Amino acid sequence: LGKDRLAGDEIDLISINSSFINAQPLPLPYSGNERIIEPNAYDILIAGWCRYWNDIFGPDLTIEANFIKALIESESRFNPLAIAKNKKSVGPARGLVQITEQTLKILKDRKGEIKDHYIDIEKEELFIPSKNLCAAIRWLFRKREILQKRLQRSPTWVETIVEYKGLGPDLKKNGHRSLKVMNDFLSIYKRYR
């Protein structure tokens, strides 16, 4: 009872709904120096999915479109077909916000760690921007929930990114690489603020 599940076709329908398409505010336009193909092409989807999940979870600290746009730039440089190899147990990361196979399994598993708002899509669908964004933002809310329990306080979204990127508590995992990954994200995020 009360277990909400979004399948691929429902995600498609939500993302063409007029209130979704007209969600505000849109993220700021890309202003980086890299030559990136269509970096602003996903702005409506970003704003729509931020609003959708903020409405669902009603967090004390809402997730912002600029934050998600910075995350996309740091994860895939706006390439919806990006794929990154990972440890076999985690599986490759796919799409705009680099969702791993392990994460997708968790988002689908009705007997697992999440208790509601499942995302029921196939790994190939992670290359579809709307589905990738839907899953990624849902996963960020889960990561924030885990972090909140551990810290015993309301974490910032930047703190949540450390968890999302798998950099471990206090950036201790992977040594200097963790710091480099976080600094890359923070310098990108700064441009969107």
Language-model features and meaning:
Residues 4-193:
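Catalytic glycan-binding domains that act on GlcNAc-containing polysaccharides
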